[in-house]
Structures are given as structure tokens and as C-alpha cells.
Amino acid sequence: MTDSTIRDVMTAEPEARATPFEMATRDFLFGNVWSRPGLSRRDRRWVTLTCVAAADAPQPIEDHVYAAMKSGDIVFDEMLEFVLQFAVYCGWPKGSHVEGVARQQWARVHSERGEAAPPWPALASASLGDNDWEQRLRRGEQEFRDVNLVSAPPRDTPYNQAGILNFVFGHVWQRPGLSRRDRRIITVACVGIDDSPLPIMSHVGSALESGDLTIAEMREIILHFSAYYGFPKAEQLDRTATDAWARITSRQQKT
């Protein structure tokens, strides 16, 4: 059963395991975590890709980008949307590296099929959204409210106006290439990595309160995250999820 999970996830034959790390990878990571039914394999791909991309380990990045696309769990256009969402929350240099890997592994997948990778299409300017700045900012404010379930910040700093309202919520969160739920999963993993208390509270809480993620799914995301980025960071996510869910259920009971 475990070997079958490895084949399905990594799209490769299992290797011999000798060290404690290798044995734990087989028995715990694939035998327990990846095989759990609480999330789809695609959902787990998003958490894993976020973690390995942030960890800067070249081989795991290559392995998981390749496997995600070869398996068909994530198509190439979705991988590129992931890169953009990831870059927003974990930084442009890391995003640049993952995009380079995506290009290489996309070509590899096609090469293994005996095909030439098709040329990249030029993206239309219209895909950038509204170029009326006032309309864009208003739409960004609304998207911020829809995603975070709180009031939008004032347009009083470059970070808020140009960054949060114009770009992150005025454009990225509105792009059609991924569902809001996909972006929630990626973002929760990113803020867990980044260690910033307010974004962790905001994104974990709003993912649960919106209903985009159930508490059971959030628990599974946190377990999967802990396997790829560490139990201490996951502990903070778990505490935040517990506190957020207690507040949500308390409010529901009062209504």
C-alpha cells in the first residue's frame, strides 16, 4: 500500500530505504500522511509545493513540481498561477526559482512522452485586469473584504495602496487560473512559513469562517505542512486554527 502511494504521488518507483530519515519518509510521510483521506491529493500537492519551494532544497522542488504535472493533478497553467500566488506571500526570488523549475519540468514531461513542449503563449494585456486605477482599487477593497472578512485597509501607504489593494487583492486573488479555495490552501501554508502572527490569524480564520475550508480540512493541511516544514511552525498554525474555530462556533451558538 505504501509503495503504491509513493508511485502515485512521486510518479516514480520507490527507492530502497536504509537510514532513519529514509524509513520515516516511507512509513510516516507516504504511509501515513499522504494516504490520509481528509484532503485530495491535489490539495496536498499545494501544501507540498509551497513548503518545498520555501525550503530552497533544489531536488525536492524539482521532484514535486515534476510529479504534480506528470500525474495530471496540476496542469501547467495552474502551476504558473501557483508560482504567482506563492511569490506574493513568500517572495519574488523564491518564486523566480520555482518558475524556472516549472519550465524545465514541463519540458521534461513532454520529452518523456516523445513530444516537443509547445511554445509558451503570449499573455494578453487584458489578463492584467482593469487599468482604471480608481476602479481597480475599489475592486481590490471589495476583494480584500471578501477574502479576509474584515474591512479593507486605508490607502495611506505604498504597501496598502500599491501592494495590497492594487496588486494582491486588486489583481492576484481575482485571477481565474485557480479557485479561491486553492489560493486559500497555498496562502495558509505560506503564512505558516513566514511566521507573521497577524497574517496567520487573518488567513487561517477567514479560510474557516468563509467555509472555503472546513476545520477537518484545516487540521489535515496543518499535519501535511508539519511533515514538510516542521512541527514547531505547524504548532502555531494549529493553535491559531483551534482559537479561530472556537470563536466561530461560539458566535454561531449565540445566533
What do the PLM-derived regions correspond to, one by one?
Residues 1-42, 54-55, 63, 70, ...:
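Acidic, glycine/proline-rich low-complexity segments that act as flexible tails and inter-domain linkers
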Residues 26, 43, 61, 79, ...:
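N-terminal alpha-helical segment
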Residues 35, 39, 48-49, 60-85, ...:
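A cross-kingdom feature marking solvent-exposed beta-strand/loop segments within repeated
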Residues 44-52, 82-83, 183-191, 221-222:
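Short, structured motif recognition centered on aromatic/hydrophobic residues
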Residues 53-60, 192-199:
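Short, thiol/selenol-centered motifs that function as redox-active sites or metal-ligating centers
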Residues 88:
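Phosphate/ribose-phosphate-bearing ligand recognition and processing surfaces
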Residues 93, 164-170, 194-205, 217-236:
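Long compositionally biased, domain-poor regions of proteins
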